[in-house]
A protein has these predicted regions:
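Intrinsically disordered, low-complexity regions of eukaryotic proteins
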Residues: 51, 58, 86, 104, ...
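N-terminal regions of proteins, emphasizing targeting and processing segments when present
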Residues: 25, 101-104, 113
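Autoprocessing Asn-cyclization modules and mimics
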Residues: 1-81, 111
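Viral virion structural and adsorption modules
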Residues: 1, 110-125
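Flexible linker/loop signature enriched in Pro/Ser/Thr and Pro/Gly
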Residues: 84-106
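Generic detector of low-complexity/intrinsically disordered segments
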Residues: 19, 61, 103, 121-124
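Glycine-centered flexibility motif
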Residues: 24, 51, 94, 123-124
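Intrinsic-disorder/low-complexity loop/linker signature
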Residues: 66, 76, 96, 104-106, ...
Length: 125
């Protein structure tokens, strides 16, 4: 995967879906998008139903007000649904939505740090 950069903020309070969504929805609306990234710099990740059997991470390309748009065709990611080794699922109205640091991002960071250390050790960097 070539997608590396994500947008993060520290002030995104957990919110809820305004209406239910099915597993192929390409956008969703929450009760309050305040504090979430807007995607203008980089895509960001949210988690739906954290801790539930149907927990799903979603790569989001943009947010306008309370409406989030699911990423598609960004850096080799064909769909942002079921991101970070989760599965796309249906979620009911009032399902919890939170901003999250995902394992894919942490793996990308780890690989980049490792690669740079190897280059430094080799005297290339």
């Amino acid at each position: 995967m070539t997608l590396k950069r994500r947008e993060f903020v520290g002030a995104a309070s957990e919110t809820e879906l305004s209406a239910g969504i099915n597993s192929s929805a390409t956008s969703f609306t929450v009760t309050s998008g305040s504090g979430f990234p807007d995607g203008s710099s980089y895509p960001f990740v949210v988690v739906l139903d954290r801790g539930a059997n149907d927990e799903e991470k979603v790569l989001v390309s943009s947010r306008s007000g309370n409406t989030f748009t699911v990423a598609a065709n960004i850096g080799g990611v064909t769909s942002g649904r079921g991101f970070d080794s989760t599965s796309a699922a249906s979620h009911d109205s009032a399902s919890k939505v939170g901003h999250v640091l995902d394992a894919t991002t942490m793996t990308d960071i780890s690989q980049t740090v490792y690669d740079n250390e190897v280059l430094y050790w080799m005297g290339v960097a």
